């Protein structure tokens, strides 16, 4: 009830202004007085949770006085927020049916009706009304409608038409190019899943990079294709390019790079050189641990010394876990020490199990897997490794 009162405040304010204005401008009009009484009656129905009667009352007023359109739109939003979608739809449908609506008012009503159907999950109907807004106008209402269409197409995975609509937005918002790049990546991934011609896949990935040069996802897929074709040099070049695209995703390149360097003539020496160079530029725990793994293959003591220095500069649970492993690998580690270290290792592991691996920089959504589209805030490329 308290929430309803807060939602009604702007409507009540608008209604109060409208009533005062109509009385001031035409105090002799019995029709205006009747509208005023009906408005108060409608608000009373709302406050008493009699929504159907409220809708009937407001529709009746609309038939008499077109000046109440803005308030009717606000009421529609109120019903939608309360989850009373059917009543919001009815109110907006009656608005659209009015023959003397101003152009902007009709666009608002069409957009509102599209949003009603979108919230109700009736995406086909929502799409129809959003297109009607776009066909009529190129204003802010049309821009909002296009964004809703993109949400629909993303849910339905209709990537070709999503690209077409997103290009319309690019006229006034260059940030949409990031979305377009991901749509091409989605198409490329679909082709890969059907074992299609890889040339077509590469073409789509190149288009993705054309729209967004920082599209890490496109290069991750390209790198995987190069590995599958055993083109190790090419794969290394692709994965190393990700460091410049977005260093936050360096972690995602370490395992495939290790695979590539094992087959490359420079071997682990080449990989170690690259990792040290990258660590000097970007102090990331994943890089330190990758270096430790390579050093440990030849000298456990040096690996222990290196990791200790890294942890002093940047403590982390994965680093501490690896440090315990290095101590366990020491030749002079006693049985008692091993028992204590294994207990500590188990505790660290439990702490790590409760920690997310990825987090959305936009909304804070935590995840154990890398989603390119955040399921919470619906933004692309905002989920990154921690």
Predicted feature locations:
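Alpha-helical segment of the N-proximal tetratricopeptide repeat
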Residues: 31-67, 74, 80-90, 94, ...
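Structural register within alpha-helical repeat arrays
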Residues: 41, 75, 113, 149, ...
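Residue at a conserved register position within TPR or TPR-like alpha-solenoid repeats
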Residues: 45, 79, 117, 153, ...
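Structural motif corresponding to the intra-repeat A-B loop/turn of tetratricopeptide repeats
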Residues: 48, 82, 120, 156, ...
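Short coil turns that delineate tetratricopeptide repeat
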Residues: 66, 100, 104, 138-140, ...
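TPR alpha-solenoid repeat register
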Residues: 71, 105, 109, 142-145, ...
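Alpha-helical repeat scaffolds
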Residues: 89-97, 125-133, 159-171, 197-208, ...
